[in-house]
């Protein structure tokens, strides 16, 4: 600290001292003790004259000084002056991604700071700085940077704090989304709106502007505009925003549901980009999962430009692309929606045929390079069969993973002399000593943060009627898989082959799928 304050010390020496302070402070928070306020004040005064990597280093050091517990002696005034200086640095260096990222880390730490009043003060000051920058009249790059920072602070701020800024944050966000063209800014703001809908739904949906226009009407205008824009706007952020709004608005959407469904399916019919397609399918699947009867009836009665019903168009695209969904939460929603669709099957879907299993190549044909590059040929099967295939496939996959987890748990609990070791030295297929081991470590670390204790597992499964808890269930992902497997098994057991469309669906299953269904 003395080196940093020395007027005749060289710049490299001062930077080395700052880096040492940062490293020590991150490792031992009590290192500087009562000097924290003085050091923070000194570093804060350096922010306006620092640039590039030097500014990043200073920001990282300031972040290390932010209190992590209530024993800190730092006053709210010191943290306020630091926040002001940081926000001023953002305004001057928003074009530098590294500086922008460091500033977001500091603001997130301030939002978690236990000093009384610091989180609320940080959120208010941040929104006062970012909200005016959401404009089409500002310099290029200002709006997307402000939108990204708003998303960052919204993600960390708790619901109580967000309620206090809805009245001036929502108008700024909505105003830009109704006229802005920057894709990056729009995607960040869609995520911000999704966070507001999840954390403070009553405040966001109960807001009215000066003309007494309800926020829901403004949100619907935003959705309408986004659906009319390029497909790259309608990515994952758009899907999360839609589902968050659908989940919180509920029956408030009933008057506009016909127009909303028509707009979503019309966009889906024209979509060519995978992100846009999967996003629209996810939003429609959510509505199908929670409002199946109304959604099926409305889509069946809606005719698109080509004369085809919206229900047929939606189901055709859905069954073709649903397997590309990789997120567990989204996959759960799709499986629930497919079960609901099967239970509300309509005559308009009886004559819909889609791609089934891949047809084998003829034995008598020589496989040339051009034939090898040709598209695979698929068996055409009824749509009802494809739905049943997807549900059986998901059940079989989940059941296999649960059985493997149970087997590992049983072996781990067995006495050492009874544990299987015959394959201790056997080679494993497709293992790369660099990539695969690192990926396995990454997966382990990812799951460790989601571990549940035995009581929580039992409680979560008992809530859905599962009394017999399988062994080896330790993570939230495992619990979700058990729930999904249980629901799929109940649904598949309830099928009655005497119902015409059910009988037709079962008749086109292959031998493996029929065996799986019979085992239930």
Where is each model-derived feature located?
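Karyopherin-beta/Importin-beta family HEAT-repeat alpha-solenoid scaffold
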Residues: 1-520
